[in-house]
Design a protein with these regions (language model features):
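Regulatory and interdomain segments flanking nucleotide-handling catalytic cores
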Residues: 1-391
Length: 391
């Protein structure tokens, strides 16, 4: 019998490529004993979004994934991006590296982005002591990238504990910088092509996903599949070659200390110029193929996920959206679901690209005017007007 090590756990999970598989309990496996959850979210994301700073909030959430994965050698560990935060599951042997990375990114987010990042490390064993679990599935978004799906109630419980101030991590000294190699936010917002970009969060009304909730998720997914490419917000050939100056400035802040940021911006502009020229001419630059890279951006994007509930940011027309809302509202009336939904004109993409030559670059999708954070605020009964987007 083959023994699967902690390092190989996620890679050894069976793959599924039809997104409907997120509701199949047979696709999930419990995290090994002794693992921990490294998680973070932005405190006060609501006023930041209302001030038009959602890209900063998104950047902070993605930086958690970049910092933690870089600190542990970019191993293949399950994680999920939540818009204004993130969660990474790791073997207990890597807890110290994860603590150091979380503490460093907390300082960076505060000093460079002017936001407050809440951080925690929660043992998986503690979720099981509460009668919950953290089970993980491996969804193949493309031949080159897989994303983790989480089920069992444990990640939601861990997030609640973090927000209550438990399982905290000691603060790092001022000036501490995380390793954010590969973190990128160069792309301009991606405009809706079918109607609107809609961010949806749907979680079980009774705390755990029973059959009625699974049927609801399958019904929503079935509606989205009626549109081209399952209502994917990124065109099949990738986003337009349009780049955000604010995003480039943010990326330079993330990947270079203060004294080297001008140089870093020049490097980024040079990379973008090469990309545009190679794309227009259809020629490679060494091993970098701009047209292939742009297509892979679309295929590798995480526009839908399951983390103790359904999260998706889709490009949907009015008729299909109405049917989705009707399903959700009927299920809410029966106590099957709690949900939040937010419409906006465009989507945002924040990227983790260890090397553009490799095809396993990852792209995190959210709405450009509040996305998941606004959807979550509506689920909890808060009021937040549509936020402008400072891109």
């Amino acid at each position: 019998m083959t023994t699967v090590t902690d390092e190989d756990f996620f890679a050894a999970l069976p793959l599924f490529s039809a997104f409907e598989g997120v509701t199949d309990p047979g696709n999930y496996r419990p995290l090994p004993d002794g693992w921990v959850l490294a998680l973070a979210d932005i405190v006060g994301s609501t006023p930041a979004i209302a001030a038009g700073r959602y890209k900063d909030v998104n950047m902070a959430g993605a930086s958690v994934i970049s910092a933690v994965l870089n600190s542990v050698g970019k191993g293949d560990y399950p994680f999920v991006f939540g818009g204004d935060g993130a969660l990474i599951a790791l073997p207990g042997s890597l807890e110290k590296q994860a603590r150091d990375a979380l503490a460093a990114v907390q300082v960076w987010v505060e000093e460079d982005l002017g936001l407050t990042l809440r951080i925690a490390i929660v043992p998986v064993a503690d979720t099981r002591a509460e009668g919950l679990d953290v089970r993980v599935a491996r969804y193949s978004a493309s031949p080159y990238v897989t994303y983790a799906m989480f089920w069992g109630g444990g990640t939601s419980w861990a997030e609640k504990q973090m927000k209550l101030g438990r399982y905290g991590v000691d603060r790092a000294p001022a000036g501490t910088r995380p390793d954010l190699t590969g973190l990128s936010c160069r792309w301009s917002p991606i405009e809706a092509r079918h109607g609107e970009i809609v961010s949806i969060i749907a979680v079980p009304g009774e705390g755990r996903p029973g059959q009625e909730f699974r049927d609801l998720v399958n019904g929503i997914v079935a509606i989205t599949t009626e549109q081209n490419r399952d209502s994917h917000p990124v065109p099949v050939d990738g986003p337009n070659l349009a780049f955000s100056l604010h995003g480039i400035n943010r990326e330079a802040k993330a990947t270079a200390p203060a004294g080297r940021r001008l140089r870093q911006k020049l490097i980024i502009f040079l990379q973008l110029a090469i990309t545009v020229v190679c794309y227009k001419l259809g020629i490679p630059f060494g091993r970098f193929d701009a047209r292939r890279y742009k297509r892979d951006v679309a295929g590798n994007s995480d526009f839908r996920k399951f983390d103790d509930g359904l999260k998706m940011t889709i490009d949907v027309d009015a008729e299909h959206l109405k049917r989705i809302e009707t399903l959700l509202e009927a299920a809410r009336a029966k106590g099957i679901v709690r949900y939040g939904l937010h419409r906006q004109a465009s989507a945002l993409m924040t990227c983790f690209v260890p090397t553009p030559i490799s095809r396993d670059h990852m792209h995190f999708i959210d709405g450009a005017a509040g996305g998941y954070a606004v959807a979550a605020s509506r689920m909890t009964g808060k009021s937040l007007s549509t936020a402008p987007s400072m891109i």
